[in-house]
Structure formats: C-alpha cells, structure tokens
C-alpha cells in the first residue's frame, strides 16, 4: 500500500505574480509528489471556486493562505494514511469533505493541488511516467498544439476583442516537427511586426499583443508569417480562435469595441462564419456567451460540421453541463481545464463523456500558470489529441511543450501525431 504519511501546502506565485497553491504529498516509501495549480483571467461563472483570502492589504486580496491552511489541517487529517494509488477514492473523500456543489468551502485550488500531488506520488511509487500512470499501455498519442501567438481580450492590453489567435500545425509527422513549425512561425511573425514598427511585447500566454486595426488584419498577418516561415496556410498550418465571447457580451449584444460593432447572436454567427470562409479556421472556442444557448445552437447549426466549436466557459469541465450540451446539440468539443472542476477524477470523467459523444476534448492551460506540466501528461495519458498551452515564449508555457517532447522521446516508435485526424468531430 502506498500510504500517505505527510502533506504540505504552501503559497507560491504564478506567471502573473499572483499567489497560487502548491502541495507536496509524501508516501511511506519516501516517494514524493508535488503539484501547483493554475489560475484563469477570463473565467466561466459556473467554474469551481478558487479560494482567495480577500485581504486587501496583502497581494491585493489574492492571497491563498486560507486554501493552504485547509490543506495543512482538514484535508491532511482526512487523507492521511490513505492509499495514494486509489485516486478515485481519494478524490471522493475530498469532495465529501468539502460538501458544496462548487468547492467553495475548501477551495478548488486546495483540492486540485492535493489531487494532482497524490497522483504524481503514486506514479513515482509505481515506477511509471505520469502519462503512463494515467493512461496505461494505450497512452501513445501526442496532442496537436493550438499555439496562441497573438493575444487580445482579457489576456492583453490592446484593441483586439478576440482573446486568442492560434496556429495549429497539422501536416507534420511528429510532435517535435509540429513544435518546430510553431516556433518558426512565431519568429517569422515577430520579424513582420518589428518591420512594421508594431509592438513585439507578449501577453499573459506568451503571444504578441500588438494593436491591429481589426481581427481580419490580425489573421491576414498570421497567414503572412506562416508563408514567411516556409509553410502552407490551410495545409501545413491551420488557424484557431478563442473569442471568449462572454467577455464582450453586454445587454444582449456582442460588442466588438475594437471594430465599433454591436451584434446580435445571429449577426455574430454571420461574423464568425465570414471569418471561417475567408481564413483556414479549424476551431473556434467560446464563440457565444456562456448563457446564450440559443446563440450556441445557431452557431453549431451553421458551422458545426466544418469548424470545431469548443465550449470553455460554456461547459467549465463539468459533466452535468456537458451532458446537457450534448443532448441539445450544442458545440462539438469541450475545453478541459483541471482547475475549473478541481479533481483529476472529475476531469477524466469529462474527457471520457466527450469522447463517447464524439466531441473532442482539448486539454488547456490557464493564463496564470506555473512550471507544473501535468496537463502535458494528461493530454497523452488520456489520448486527448489536442492541447492548448500558449505561445512559443515564456517558460511557464514552454515547460508543457518540453514535457511533451520528453514523452514523445520516451514512447519512441509507438508515438503517434494525429494531425488533422485530431478533429474527428468534423464531418
């Protein structure tokens, strides 16, 4: 038995300089697992609650000492002595201890840190790489990366309303070559922006954050960068968007302040359809407000057969909400953010539910990240097929890409890179 003998929670800083939670779990054998949790900027209203201290004079109220205290007291007492290899039972214990629907008592940040650290300790105890511990012998597929090379919206201080403009390398034979492609396009874009006298400063997720005149201009410039790097847009590299539409939905309208537009759900559907016709866009995330299910239905009926429509704020990694979306034919993909739900067991359940319905599952970082690379192992372990973990700069993003390189090397000849087939939800 891999008995838990010690648990230590601590407050550390994330990539934005805000506090977050880290946890160490020590097993009887001396094996240790360590995990740190991320934090989002644009968040869905139905996400599990991230417990913050609210003490204005300390970190602007964003301290996490309460969550850390929960780890070091209540949670520690509840799971001490449990078998670390019994992940589902451990997560069930955490859920029962919290006792709320949204993890507001203990905090999803406290619960997730423990859930992840236990899994890491158990994998180490078993002598298995984390991805293999998660997925067994079937874990062999690397994910297609959606690389956020231009940041807008809540992730940057510029005039772009759409939050993320991403490149998606799909023609390469390996993840290593796909990563190289992304890096070369990133550097080509930097050169283009520099030549135009535009900012090459980067946003929260490592992408550039210049002031483009429109979303159209931004996408056109990315196409130029793809070609400048020696690749073919629409063949080697596709595009993806994260609208984060809940962030600019006010008074029943989608208000694109950067373009001076106020659009109804039907008009915004037309707007996105026009972009998808003009550019090789394979995926659109949060194309409607999380509560605008009628708008989501319109968007799905219009674009759902040729564009991946990802629900992030819409589904918040929650199987109850995802089940309702599947039944109503809303979207065709779910974004998986481990801190939206708060335990690994619930995260894996959402991925499996999506797959059974032929929805894709895109494993995702948050805008506030750490060096923790667990999501890379989840992406491979669960054969998710797609990952979103930022641009080709900032070590908090690169740590996930580098872990995927190590995993691909470890898998050797059995490693596969799905390319366009990762989008099995499109017909």
Curated annotation (Swiss-Prot):
The gene is eno. It comes from the Bacteria. Catalyzes the reversible conversion of 2-phosphoglycerate (2-PG) into phosphoenolpyruvate (PEP). It is essential for the degradation of carbohydrates via glycolysis. Binds a second Mg(2+) ion via substrate during catalysis. It is found in: Cytoplasm; Secreted; Cell surface. This is Enolase. Its cofactor is Mg(2+). (2R)-2-phosphoglycerate binds at residues 163, 337, 366-367, 388. Keywords: Cytoplasm, Glycolysis, Lyase, Magnesium, Metal-binding, Secreted.
């Amino acid at each position: 038995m891999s008995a838990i003998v010690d648990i230590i929670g601590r407050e550390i800083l994330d990539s934005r300089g805000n506090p977050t939670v880290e946890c160490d779990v020590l097993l009887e054998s001396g094996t240790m697992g360590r995990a740190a949790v991320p934090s989002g900027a644009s968040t869905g209203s139905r996400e599990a609650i991230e417990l913050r201290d609210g003490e204005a004079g300390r970190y602007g109220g964003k301290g996490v000492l309460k969550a850390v205290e929960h780890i070091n007291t209540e949670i520690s007492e509840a799971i001490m002595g449990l078998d670390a290899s019994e992940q589902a039972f451990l997560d069930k214990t955490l859920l029962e201890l919290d006792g709320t629907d949204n993890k507001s008592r203990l905090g999803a940040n406290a619960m997730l840190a423990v859930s992840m650290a236990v899994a890491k300790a158990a994998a180490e105890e078993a002598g298995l790489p984390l991805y293999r511990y998660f997925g067994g012998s079937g874990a062999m597929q690397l994910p297609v990366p959606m690389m956020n090379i231009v940041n807008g919206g809540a992730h940057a201080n510029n005039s772009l309303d759409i939050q993320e403009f991403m490149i998606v390398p799909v023609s390469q034979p390996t993840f290593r070559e796909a990563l190289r492609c992304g890096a070369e396009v990133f550097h080509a874009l930097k050169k283009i922006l520099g030549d135009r006298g535009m900012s090459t400063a980067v946003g929260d997720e490592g992408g550039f954050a210049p002031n483009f005149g429109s979303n159209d201009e931004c996408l056109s410039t990315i196409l130029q960068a793809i070609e400048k790097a020696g690749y073919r847009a629409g063949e080697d590299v596709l595009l993806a968007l994260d609208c984060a539409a809940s962030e600019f939905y006010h008074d029943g309208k989608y208000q694109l302040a950067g373009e001076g537009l106020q659009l109804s759900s039907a008009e915004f559907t037309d707007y996105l359809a026009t972009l998808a016709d003009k550019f090789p866009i394979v995926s659109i995330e949060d194309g409607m407000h999380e509560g605008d299910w009628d708008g989501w239905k319109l968007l799905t009926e219009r674009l759902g057969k040729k564009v991946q429509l990802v629900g992030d704020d819409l589904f918040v990694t929650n199987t109850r909400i995802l089940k309702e979306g599947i039944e109503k034919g809303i979207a065709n993909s779910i974004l998986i953010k481990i801190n939206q739900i708060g335990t690994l067991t619930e995260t894996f359940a959402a991925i499996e539910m999506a797959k059974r319905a032929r929805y894709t599952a895109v494993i995702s970082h948050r805008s506030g990240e750490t060096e923790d690379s667990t999501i890379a192992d989840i992406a491979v372990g669960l054969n998710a097929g797609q990952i979103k973990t930022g641009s080709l700069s900032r070590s908090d993003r690169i740590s996930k890409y580098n872990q995927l390189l190590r995993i691909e090397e470890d898998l050797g000849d059995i490693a596969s890179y799905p390319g366009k087939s990762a989008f099995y939800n499109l017909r």
